[in-house]
C-alpha cells in the first residue's frame, strides 16, 4: 500500500499554505489513483482543534498520512526549529522524491552517512537543472540555462 505525507505548519490555530498542501495531496492522489475523489484538508484540520492538547502550542506541526482510501492518520506535535550549521553533500541521482512518500528509507540511509554534519544536501543531476534538497525545511533549486547557472530559488516545504 502506497502512503504519502503532508507536514503542515499551524501557527496559533492558522493552517499555513493550505492551498499548496491541498494541491500537492490531490495531485499525488490523482497521479497514483486517477479515480480518487479530491480531498480538502480543511475538513480534517479544524482550526479550533488544531494541535489541541499540545503543551505550549503556539506553532504546531500536523503530520497527515494519506493514501488511496483518503486520510489514514493525522497527528500533531510541537514545532521545533532545527538549527542547521553544517551540511554534508550527498549525490543520489536515483532517489525520486517527487511525491512525498511516507517510506523514507533511502533518505534515512543517506542521512545516516552525514557524519558530524547536522543535515544533508542531496544533489541530483539533470540535463536542464540540478536539485539540492535537505531533509529539513527547504528545497533549493538551481536551473542551468544557456551555459550559466541561476541560484537562489528557495522553496519552503511548509
Residue ranges and their predicted role:
Residues 130-133:
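Short beta-strand/strand-turn micro-motif
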